Amino acid sequence: MKRKVPNIIITGVPGSGKSTLCEELKEIINKELLKRNDMEGFEMTHLNLSNIIKDERLYKEFDDELDASIYSEELLNEYLKKKYKLEKGGYIIDFHDINFVKDVDIIDKIFLLTIQTNFLYERLEKRNYTKEKIKNNIECEIFQVIKEDILDHFPNTNILQEIENNDLQQYDNNLSIIKNWVLSYI
């Protein structure tokens, strides 16, 4: 049975603009839902999984070289199952990895934000990422690691839409693309 509101994943390497886009997207879509009589009581919720993992300590170890925690898929899934009803829909899931998804049927669409490496380098440098961490993320973008993970993990390749997110014009266009997809689902 189709959910009344979809679950979407916004993914991409760190620095591709996921969290900023997700937060604004949530606000825009929820304003649209308020205008519709048939959507009373429904709203989209932004789940920033990186923040949840950090705040709830859902990691198994720390990688000193990359200055990053290695999250536990098991702990994350237990937490999500206990705290949220993903099967009901209404979630904008913001994360750089999709391998945590055990039930692929709970996801209706994946938007993969891509970014040119020169823009990515600048954004990660502004975040004071280590040289090794910047190199690792740029290599992930060049070799399309996240896209390959999605295609390996989800049998329905129509679930994926790639969108480039280098500048403000593309950002605004991406907001519109995703908003329109969500509203057409409803």
UniProtKB/Swiss-Prot annotation:
Q: Which GO terms describe its biological process?
A: ribosomal small subunit biogenesis; rRNA processing
Top-tier EC class: transferase
Which PANTHER family does the annotation name? Answer: ADENYLATE KINASE ISOENZYME 6, POS9-ACTIVATING FACTOR FAP7-RELATED
Question: To which protein family does this belong?
Answer: Belongs to the adenylate kinase family. AK6 subfamily.
From the UniProt entry, list the residue stretches annotated as the region NMPbind.
Answer: 48-71
Tell me where it mainly resides: cytoplasm
User: What is the catalytic activity of this protein?
Assistant: AMP + ATP = 2 ADP; ATP + H2O = ADP + phosphate + H(+)
The UniProt entry's coiled-coil ranges are none
Biological role: Broad-specificity nucleoside monophosphate (NMP) kinase that catalyzes the reversible transfer of the terminal phosphate group between nucleoside triphosphates and monophosphates. Also has ATPase activity. Involved in the late cytoplasmic maturation steps of the 40S ribosomal particles, specifically 18S rRNA maturation. While NMP activity is not required for ribosome maturation, ATPase activity is. Associates transiently with small ribosomal subunit protein uS11. ATP hydrolysis breaks the interaction with uS11.
Cellular location(s): Cytoplasm; Nucleus
Species lineage: Eukaryota, Sar, Alveolata, Apicomplexa, Aconoidasida
GO MF term list:
adenylate kinase activity; ATP binding; ATP hydrolysis activity
Question: Keywords for this entry?
Answer: ATP-binding, Cytoplasm, Kinase, Nucleotide-binding, Nucleus, Ribosome biogenesis, rRNA processing, Transferase
GO CC annotations, alphabetized: cytoplasm; cytosol; nucleus
Q: Where does ATP bind?
A: 15, 17-20, 127
Tell me the protein's name.
Answer: Adenylate kinase isoenzyme 6 homolog
Spell out the residue ranges making up region: LID.
Answer: 126-136
Task: Check the record and name the InterPro entries matching this protein.
Answer: Adenyl_kinase_AK6 (IPR020618), P-loop_NTPase (IPR027417)
Pfam families noted in UniProt: AAA_18
Record's subunit section:
Monomer and homodimer. Interacts with small ribosomal subunit protein uS11. Not a structural component of 43S pre-ribosomes, but transiently interacts with them by binding to uS11.
**EC number of this enzyme:** 2.7.4.3
Q: Where is the signal peptide?
A: none
